[in-house]
């Protein structure tokens, strides 16, 4: 648990530093800004804003899992990098961490969704690209008695990895993401 909190703080600090540096730089050619809409098995509909410099950028995202039985939504942040980037193609590696809310506007219990995505994109217009790729997903949720009830997350669509501990449940799965991206060349 302490390791996850440390990683979360590290990601947030790097995002803030990256965003601040990207806004103060005088060379706007290195500034990267994008907005994308995507669908996946974890968050069925997701909107993401990206800002940073060309090699590294920050991500801010909100999404929902509307095909599930219960109401679920999440918000999060992350960091990404361009592994390959040219005029018509790019390959990005991204790490996202979300707080998941289930069956209510705000879930007080620790309910964390982490995602690593490898995305290939193809430019189809001057400011429009389509993208897709595999993702590794992990949902870690508090399963102990707290806030007057016992919480058990139902966020994962399926799992190939599952671990139940004294305080937390972890479920992992491999997924896929498809979407459209609005950005400049």
Language-model features, listed with the residues they occupy:
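N-terminal non-cleavable signal-anchor helices
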Residues: 10-17, 57, 68, 83-85
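Intrinsically disordered, low-complexity segments enriched in glycine/proline and serine/threonine
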Residues: 5-8, 53, 97
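Cleavable N-terminal export/targeting peptides
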Residues: 1-28, 184-185
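Short glycine/proline- and aromatic-enriched beta-strand/turn motifs that initiate or cap beta-hairpins
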Residues: 22-70, 181-185
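Solvent-exposed loop segments that connect transmembrane elements
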Residues: 146-160
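Extracytoplasmic loops and strand-loop junctions of Gram-negative outer membrane beta-barrel proteins
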Residues: 31, 101-103, 157-164
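Outer-membrane beta-barrel "beta-signal"
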Residues: 79, 169-185
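Outer-membrane beta-barrel translocator/channel fold
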Residues: 61-149, 169-171
């Amino acid at each position: 648990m302490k390791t996850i909190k440390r990683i979360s703080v590290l990601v947030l600090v790097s995002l803030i530093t990256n965003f601040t540096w990207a806004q103060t730089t005088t060379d706007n050619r290195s500034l990267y800004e994008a907005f994308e809409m995507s669908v996946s098995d974890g968050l069925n509909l997701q909107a993401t804003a990206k800002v940073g410099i060309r090699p590294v950028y920050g991500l801010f995202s909100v999404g929902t899992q509307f095909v599930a039985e219960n109401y679920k939504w999440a918000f999060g942040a992350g960091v990404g990098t361009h592994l390959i980037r040219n005029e018509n193609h790019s390959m990005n590696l991204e790490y996202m961490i979300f707080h998941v809310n289930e069956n209510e506007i705000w879930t007080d219990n620790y309910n964390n969704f982490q995602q690593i995505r490898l995305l290939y994109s193809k430019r189809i217009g001057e400011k429009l690209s389509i993208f897709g790729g595999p993702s590794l997903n992990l949902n870690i949720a508090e399963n102990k008695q707290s806030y007057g009830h016992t919480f058990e997350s139902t966020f994962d669509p399926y799992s190939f990895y599952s671990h139940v501990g004294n305080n937390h449940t972890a479920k992992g799965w491999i997924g896929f993401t498809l979407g459209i991206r609005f950005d400049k060349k």
